[in-house]
């Protein structure tokens, strides 16, 4: 039964002993909320009246509604064999819930240092100085969308992080970002044209992310080897007001040096994150995201066209009504011993009309694998 406006549901049952349960799913600003409750041992007698009410207390659990489905940062080999090309980065966000997601004051951030194997000034005696401080430091600056971002249930958006153009016209191993849904482009703050050529005309200017820079540099240099990337919402505070508030700024033992300036993003604001370690620097790499945000890391071999791609939640996906006969198995896009343990080819299944539920345990070691081809090339 469905409850009325007062939260009541009515049943007509014979006398006996019953168990009542209730559940509800809601979504708000990038999160899914599941409310569940159960009450056992309800004795219904012949004298029971309509005035008798049984209350079922609901317990709330929260999960990410909008998740990072894919992060492509490693670049590819140039056609002439002269080296690698790395100005074609993108991220795909996916609505992993059953409700439409509308995100207000939506932002992109990355953690200093840019590479996991670099010296991390925030480590003190082997522990991150902010490990228990309920924030994540966003380095250099943040990108924010000046309007709401809406993603329908089971749908995705592509954000070009560099070069919202068709890179394959020059480098055939690259990707076409001229058809991206959104892009980062703010030439006043980040003017380096290698990173930010004029975006494709097919991307509306209203879909440009704007930058707020509190550090230094002519580009927002997301690592092509081992970034720590996250998405967040500033909720009731505008991104400009938040990012300009010097009370949130700090420089991690480099006082007065704007190169190291970060701003403290409250962990409650963070919607999703992924930490990447370089395969070549694995032994020297250290975590920058705290366990509450991402308890693990995924490994990347860069410059080969590989991408960090989220694993499928096999049980949840197979349980989706209507998926039978639409799911494609025998996934073969894994590489270097890394693959999706579900065996489901998510991209092929999506094209076949299936609804994919991705795994989200807040642990990139479990949630991601290295895919040998960017999904935009499928």
Question: Would you name each region that the model predicts?
Answer:
Residues 27-57:
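Structured interaction patches on ligand/partner-binding surfaces of diverse proteins
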Residues 106-140:
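The feature marks short-to-medium sequence segments in extracytoplasmic or secretory-pathway proteins
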Residues 58-117, 204, 213-227, 232-256:
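A structural motif detector for short, solvent-exposed N-terminal "entry" segments of globular domains
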Residues 9-11, 52-54, 157:
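Short strand-edge motifs at loop-to-beta-strand transitions and within beta-strands
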């Amino acid at each position: 039964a469905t409850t009325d406006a007062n939260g009541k549901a009515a049943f007509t049952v014979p006398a006996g002993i019953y168990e009542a349960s209730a559940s509800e799913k809601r979504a708000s600003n990038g999160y899914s909320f599941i409310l569940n409750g159960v009450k056992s041992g309800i004795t219904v007698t012949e004298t029971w009246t309509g005035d008798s009410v049984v209350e079922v207390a609901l317990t709330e659990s929260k999960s990410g509604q909008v998740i990072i489905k894919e992060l492509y940062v490693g670049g590819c080999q140039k056609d002439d064999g002269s080296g690698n090309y790395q100005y074609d980065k993108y991220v795909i966000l996916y609505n992993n819930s059953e409700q439409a997601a509308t995100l207000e004051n939506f932002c992109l951030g990355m953690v200093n240092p840019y590479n996991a194997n670099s010296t991390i000034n925030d480590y003190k005696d082997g522990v991150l100085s902010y490990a228990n401080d309920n924030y994540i430091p966003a380095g250099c600056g943040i990108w924010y969308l000046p309007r709401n971002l809406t993603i329908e249930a089971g749908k995705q958006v592509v954000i070009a992080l560099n070069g919202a153009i068709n890179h394959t016209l020059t480098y055939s191993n690259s990707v076409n970002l001229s058809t991206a849904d959104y892009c980062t482009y703010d030439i006043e703050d980040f003017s380096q044209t290698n990173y930010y050529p004029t975006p494709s005309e097919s991307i509306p200017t209203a879909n440009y992310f704007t930058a707020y820079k509190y550090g230094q540099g002519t580009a927002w240099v997301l690592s092509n080897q081992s970034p720590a990337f996250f998405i967040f919402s500033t909720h009731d505070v505008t991104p400009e007001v938040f990012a300009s508030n010097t009370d949130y700024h700090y420089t991690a033992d480099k006082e007065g040096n704007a190169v190291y300036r970060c701003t403290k993003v409250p962990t409650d604001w963070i919607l999703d994150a992924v930490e990447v370690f370089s395969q070549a620097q694995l032994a020297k790499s250290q975590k920058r995201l705290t366990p509450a945000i991402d308890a693990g890391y995924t490994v990347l071999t860069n410059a080969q066209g590989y991408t960090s791609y989220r694993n499928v939640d096999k049980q949840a996906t197979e349980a989706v009504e209507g998926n039978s006969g639409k799911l494609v198995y025998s996934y073969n896009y894994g590489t270097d011993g890394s693959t999706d343990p579900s065996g489901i080819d998510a991209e092929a299944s999506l094209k076949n009309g299936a609804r994919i539920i991705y795994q989200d345990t807040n642990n990139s070691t479990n949630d991601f694998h290295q895919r040998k081809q960017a999904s935009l090339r499928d």
